[in-house]
Amino acid sequence: LLASSNNEFNARFPGVKIQRQPVHTVYGGANLFKTGTTEKLSKLAQSHFATYATDHKVMAEMLGLPAADIVGDDSSHSITQRVFDRVKSKLETEAVEDHRVDFEDGYGSRADDEEDGHAVSAAIAMAEDHKSGALARSTGIRIKSLAEETKHRSLRTLDIFVSTLVEHTEGKIPQPFLVTLPKVTTPEQVDVLCQYLSLLEQKHGIPSHSLKLELMIETIQSIVSTTGQINIPALVDAGADRVVTAVLGTFDYTASCNIAGNYQDHMHPAADFARQIMQVSLTGTKVTLCDGITNVMPIAPNRGNALSDRELAENKDVIANAWQVHFGNIMHSLRLGFYQGWDLNPAQLPIRFAAVFYFFLTGLDDASARLKAFIDKASQASLVGNTFDDAATGQGLVNFFVNGISCGALTEQDALEAGITLAELRDRSFLKIVENRSKSD
């Protein structure tokens, strides 16, 4: 009985793995998606960062970071200098990690002929970029919801897009390719979409499960079912191993909670409640967590080449405020264990990377020292038969490195310098590390 139960548990909860997880998903309307969109977004992000962060001190000022992080022991190795250098390099090499062509809120409701046309044109553009290697590492589309009023339009767009994409790529779907389902309310919606994806794969002769699912948790019914049960596990189970990510739709969710528009916010307690339900439902499974958007855009109100000092100062203030709001929201997500989020505008990308790098780099030295000390003390204690009661803390430190490496903020060398081997890190278990070292000693 126990063996069967334990095996079932381990299969469902294999643990957090060291595997690449995007730090963001960038999405934009399907009508705007053209050949070279990823490169265009990258250049816009680089230009924005170069304009408003001329060096690490200016970046720190714009973000409102502590002065201690700017100076450090050696200004060339200060936290902000390291963050600045990594952000600049990241924007030049891979500014967009994950991209979604949007047929929902970022696109709107249009005439059928118009949406049909955009489904074709966006799919052709994606096919061309796929063949030239210009796509983001991860890509996909967001369809409309499968609610009664949009279900037919949603599946029609999906069919047109996938069919056109397959036609122009000789049957080679970009991998990973995610289909994002918004405003989920019932497992039946996920089940129907899963069956439809299977039919598309069979129709076009592409490998089974080439089309993955991403579920948006943005209704109260996606959190709690009509029978009062937590609904997220049932939604994932209905996806038949296709579901790879669950995304919090912050503003739709808070709206569904009947919260007034001027109080809807990334950090609203209702949003944190949803995050925690997602976390306890999915952490340790094969489904990763992704947070929602920041709706304050870093867009300068004054344009042109001959701006007055007042206009330039106004631009800087608006941009700095947007940076700080976005940075604060991302740091909030990271502290809660959400290492990925959605971005709306290329000007938000530098701040995404700055927040992720800052989060891990500011904690690196302390985590390294504590992990090394914990492992050493645990090994010694186990040799004399004493009980080691700080396993939870040790596991948290291991998780820090696992998550930092998975999102690209830390390197495997950072972990090696903390005294942990790559094999031990891939085991993801602090207790196993201690046990194995105790045996070897």
Where are these predicted regions, by residue range?
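Expand to "…catalyze enediolate/carbanion chemistry for C-C bond making/breaking, isomerization
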Residues: 1-441
